[in-house]
């Protein structure tokens, strides 16, 4: 399930009109903090997530319903459109102590709990790795990141199958507190 990089952002813009109801006209101002910021997200990652929503592999009924009848080209166009938009940053608001601890986890992991460094896949600025299909995580809302890391930890999100369950393995070693400080920290990362 990988994009052919043949998406047309202009065609995707037309497809995205219905998406604006939840993700905002700019793709970066979701109406609820649990919804992702899509603007500037890596195209390959977006396409793969859309395809998983459509097939039901990633179980979010609202998204599956929105994608009924969409062709592969439609999904590629949507991914190209959102990838073409300027990314929106955020601000970390945690205490200095929490931000230092989150930075340690992000850059170095937690060896004794077998938690890999987030930066290994998402990069030092949280922009991900477009070629590998790893997502941009900087600028996401704290609520969205907490929800996704918790779903990975509890085994409810399995969209990492093509990577051997990597995110589930990483998140499994994180406490609620560590997830919360990481979510705040990555929101404020700058490329």
Task: Show the residue positions of the predicted features.
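Sequence context surrounding c-type heme c attachment/ligation sites in exported
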Residues: 11-17, 43, 108-119, 138-147
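The canonical Cys-X-X-Cys-His
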Residues: 17-25, 78, 115-124, 182
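Periodic glycine anchor positions in long extracellular repeat architectures
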Residues: 24-27, 40, 123, 139
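Electrostatic cytochrome c docking/interface patches
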Residues: 1-16, 26-34, 84-112
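Stable alpha-helical elements in mature extracytoplasmic
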Residues: 8, 15, 42, 49, ...
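N-terminal export/targeting leaders of redox proteins
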Residues: 1-10, 51, 176, 187-191
